[in-house]
């Protein structure tokens, strides 16, 4: 049934794509219309137009019929003051290795945007996974430029077919979050074009993406909002991009440099490209009005091409809570989960599995990455809920803190005069200054303010403070989780345990403190709203750190839900390679009590699996699987779904094994010096390319993933066509007892080259669904690009005549078929 639904969605999508594709082409007629409109704009209108306003908008010019344009973050759901479908994260989409599903994902997200009147979505993110430490790896599509490109193109085509402009980001070299505004990514020309730029190029040339967003970091010491070489030379020149080039939010660093070197639109507002500063530049001749006109034309012609001037963007026929979107989120989650270990066929659960313990920090939590990963879904399914619903014969015990917004539960919170809840004071300014306008008691901190929170307090630019005491019901750990936009911070006994005290969109932070049952702890929660609507939510729970031995020992299986979340992995910071020590301690203790341990890991990339794999009989990499993730994981555990996810990354045994380990961060001693630089010394040998060159055995190779069935490969054939393409065909057979999907991967290796080249590079793949005993023929067409490398003397890709090895297999280290071919 699931596969029928996905095929039906995709059939409709194919029709939409065929009808809508021409709408994204900037034709000479559209360019002429844009020129005429810009000619009618006053200088003041033009100077204001190239700076965003109200956070996520391009300003309207009503007298010319130029509409207000609404943008929304992000790649895995419509954010910004709305509930919406929370899809699996980007790296999960890549782990499906399914172009059709990526296209459906993009289209469903586009439909969600149309239901809310959003014109431009700020995604996908395609920065290459260079190291597991980068805090935003979860947003991206893995370590390989081909897989990243294929996934991104499909996603963009789907989204833009829905009538929503996609924005590919972050252009480019944004491969770490640590000190991202200041650290230069020093990348040689060949490495840029072979590894870090292909997804952007294909998005422009194949998917015809409407917008490109800059990165925060400099590349080769020049910020990408003012890099003439990258914007005008590569993006506009080599690739003939005619769309909008916008800055990331507060990623513009000068007026003249940005204006003269290709930036069209400064977001979220014109800090540097604003009328006051640009008038000075015009008066001194450092910027010309023609340069300003060109920016306005780029913006206007792109908006016209997408139909935004000629129709209402909100589609009232699409429900905001869309069951089709939920089904898409579930479909992606089902295919994204990677089965890493399954000793003794622990999975799927046999009929003997009747009593199950579910534990760990993510058992009842819906983990996401921080920043753009935080979407407010209408509904969610945790792993515990998923298992409860998947098989009614299974009796389940949950040993995990169940977070609640109810301030009167689990011991409870009390106002200063002893009433249940916390006492809130509201201030008519964002700094908690002066006397409170009013007070109100709350039994739950769960607010979404679209208007003033109380009389006498403005709708924006206000602050609030809640105070009281917390008396836990058990001795152990109290867990606090806060989500909100703009600033929030939490103090327990005057010690700050959570802080996100700056202007921002919705984020989520979590912290734990040791507590004693019956003891009173002072609580102070502070919040401010800077602009637009306000959101604040606090959940809490108490649990004992001592594992209940009898319950774990007597269970038929124990499922431990481990990993990171938005508090520990997200934007503007990097994260550790190791899982939190408390989790590793609990995993070890659970394994000693019960050998049937299954570990489910939530993370945006590789982690140190060494302390896990020796203790668990089964391990699943679930990424951040979105609102339906718990249901998908439960279906895989119980055998309703055969896992088909494959790693879009290489997972190292040790952090030191990663090819970038020695050069990932700038020298710490340089933190207070300028400039800060990270040299990409590994060159093109990132990911599996580097492991192959070094002869290092990874923990799990690129493309790896287990299934409940087995597959054989046979009959490799190759045919060279007159147009220079090569057609590779082979057969895949399901040799096991379960229906399942295999990801057949094709790698190309140059036998002799004038420059150092990787042993093999992914150049094709197909996901093939097979019934038990079924054989299918797979055909992959290779263009000359599959054999090329970037020549720094010619500043272009070249194919050197010679012998190449075509390898086909189940991962980069599991090659089943190979044969040489001569390319002249």
Please give the residue ranges for each predicted region.
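Bacterial Sec-dependent N-terminal signal peptides
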Residues: 1-26
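Glycoside hydrolase catalytic-domain context in secreted enzymes
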Residues: 21-479, 483-792, 798-812, 822
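Conserved glycine-rich phosphate/nucleotide-binding loop
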Residues: 815
